[in-house]
């Protein structure tokens, strides 16, 4: 079975007009940035299937001919660049019709399921909406939610191809798995330090999932995090215990630290200025400097940002300095997680075979 990418059309392959959400003329047809180079990189490994909801297609409000003209031009454009789609599957119904084929329902893909036409372990849904994520869950596969700023086509290709490596094949792959079970949480963390890829992260706290993904994405490694916590109380135990398990997994995956860079420092400048300095020293300590105006960002308590990094540093046995300034709490927290990921990327990179300490041990 070949790995398959089930790709949304409007808002993912091509721009979706925010006025009427219909591409019914050539004037509205616009490709998403970098989509063609990304698909050209991916086509050797994956086959492509378009899965799209087109509300009211074939009605007076959205005649079939109005749809066909820009759609056919789009398909011809992709084909002229060497990109073909095995199928184009379209639901023409409106939400109120309650059909069985509208995403996230899976009727459109029934033949793929019945005939085992896709590799469940290596296939993905790519789309810009939550319904695309839900479609992936219903199919039993993973999703990548497209966003032109945060998860663009360049990043999608990098994740799916796992092109970022830190080991270069010189040593056995650095992998660790940690299972942590308490009365409050049940957590499983897996990290692959020498390969990038799609991270599967589900803690039940959406903003926290996104932040953990930033660590792996900017750290240049792959990780899976599954957590079932006592969220009916609050997210404190989930965040704290995930940090402890992740820190333990990173520590185990790094191993005896022979040959690693050990140190990392990064200072990203955007709307927020985030500084991070890291030493995989074996001596846990943290200096954290950040002020937040809001109590929560989404479903995540801002006060848990410091607690997460403190728990992570002590579990990793690392020395960590973090500082951020800015106006938007969402961006400040995100910049800290990104900065930590970039710094960790430097520190875990293998540069030789020597122990990076005059003591001969870390």
Curated annotation (Swiss-Prot):
Keyword terms of this UniProt record: Amino-acid biosynthesis, Cytoplasm, Histidine biosynthesis, Hydrolase, Lyase, Magnesium, Metal-binding, Multifunctional enzyme, Zinc
Q: Name one GO molecular function term.
A: metal ion binding
Q: List, in alphabetical order, the GO biological process terms annotated in this UniProt record.
A: L-histidine biosynthetic process
Which parts of this chain are annotated as the region Imidazoleglycerol-phosphate dehydratase? 174-362
**What broad class describes the main subcellular location of this protein?**
cytoplasm
Q: Where in the cell is it found?
A: Cytoplasm
In this chain, Zn(2+) is annotated as bound at: 91, 93, 99, 101
For this entry, the protein name equals Histidine biosynthesis bifunctional protein HisB
Tell me what organism the protein belongs to.
Answer: Haemophilus influenzae (strain ATCC 51907 / DSM 11121 / KW20 / Rd)
């Amino acid at each position: 079975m070949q790995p398959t990418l089930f790709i949304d059309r409007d808002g993912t392959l091509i721009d979706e007009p925010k006025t009427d959400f219909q591409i019914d003329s050539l004037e509205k047809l616009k490709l998403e940035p970098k989509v063609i180079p990304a698909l050209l990189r991916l086509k050797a490994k994956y086959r492509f299937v378009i899965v799209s909801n087109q509300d009211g297609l074939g009605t007076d409000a959205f005649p079939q001919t109005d749809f066909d003209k820009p759609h056919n031009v789009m398909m011809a454009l992709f084909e002229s660049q060497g990109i073909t789609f095995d199928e184009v599957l379209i639901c023409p119904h409106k939400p109120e019709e309650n059909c069985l084929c509208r995403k996230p329902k899976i009727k459109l893909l029934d033949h793929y399921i019945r005939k085992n036409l896709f590799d469940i372990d290596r296939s993905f849904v790519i789309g810009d909406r939550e319904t695309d994520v839900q479609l992936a869950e219903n199919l039993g596969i993973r999703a990548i939610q497209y966003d032109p700023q945060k998860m663009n086509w360049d990043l999608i290709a990098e994740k799916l191809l796992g092109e970022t490596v830190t080991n270069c094949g010189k040593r056995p792959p650095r992998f660790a798995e940690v299972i942590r079970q308490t009365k409050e949480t049940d957590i499983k963390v897996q990290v692959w330090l020498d390969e990038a890829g799609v991270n599967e992260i589900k803690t039940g706290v959406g903003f926290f999932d996104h932040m953990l993904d930033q660590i792996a994405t900017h750290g240049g490694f792959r990780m899976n995090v599954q957590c079932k916590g006592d969220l009916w109380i609050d997210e404190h135990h989930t965040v704290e215990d995930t940090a402890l398990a992740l820190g333990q997994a990173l520590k185990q995956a790094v191993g005896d630290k022979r040959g690693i860079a050990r140190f990392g420092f990064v200072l990203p400048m955007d709307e927020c200025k985030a500084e991070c300095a890291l030493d995989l020293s074996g001596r846990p300590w943290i200096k954290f400097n950040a002020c937040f105006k809001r109590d929560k960002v989404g479903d995540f308590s801002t006060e848990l940002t410091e607690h997460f990094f403190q728990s992570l540093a002590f579990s990793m046995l690392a020395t960590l300095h973090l500082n951020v300034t800015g106006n938007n709490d969402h961006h400040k927290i995100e910049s800290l997680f990104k900065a930590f990921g970039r710094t960790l990327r430097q520190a875990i990179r293998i540069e030789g075979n020597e122990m990076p300490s005059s003591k001969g041990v870390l």
